[in-house]
Amino acid sequence: MTVTPERKEAVEFTNPNLKVAVQALVPQASTVKNLDDLATRTTIVTTGTTADIWLTKNHPDWKLLKFEKNSESLQALANGRGDAYAQDNLVLFSWAKQNPGYRVLTQTLGAEAPIAPAVKKGNIELRDWVNVELAKLGEEKFLLKLYDQYVRKELSDDTKPESVIGEGGKWQG
């Protein structure tokens, strides 16, 4: 789950193990070149996502088309109901690789953010246990091994593991 101040009020986050940034996916033939171009277009978001929250707060004048599920949002983009789909870049990199004809804009919407497991608010014992285990897994480069085995083939060839992994729960944000 992406760590946000609002979510910190509801859950206890462990140390982060991944990092993500919100970017936008557009059709390959789109005239949209950068985020400024989206100010006068329709941007699709999935309700409750980091992209939805950030755009609603920082660009209240942008036209947002909201859907409940990622699959609905992506289908809406494919059907031409919007000009771009804003979402966590890992989702977009994977989708663009599997669906030729789309590209991810290089600019990010806001800063890079940590992703971390979450536990019930107040369960400090479980949070601390997870943090200890994350540190042990980091020493073994466990997430890098998982990345190589499962994730690397899903993302673009130029995606560097350190751009998405916070091995051992270490976050430099």
Task: Place the predicted regions along the sequence by residue.
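Acidic, polar ligand-binding/catalytic clefts
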Residues: 1-37, 108
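Periplasmic-binding protein-like
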Residues: 18-26, 51, 93-151, 153-173
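Ligand-binding cleft/hinge of the Venus flytrap
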Residues: 15, 51-68, 96-97
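Short loop->beta-strand "edge-of-pocket" segments that line small-molecule binding or catalytic clefts
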Residues: 35-51
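Beta->alpha turn/N-cap motifs
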Residues: 1-4, 20, 28, 48-50, ...
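Short helix-initiation/N-cap motifs at beta->coil->alpha
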Residues: 30, 65-75, 79, 111-113
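A ligand-binding cleft/hinge motif common to bilobed small-molecule-binding domains
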Residues: 1-10, 78-111
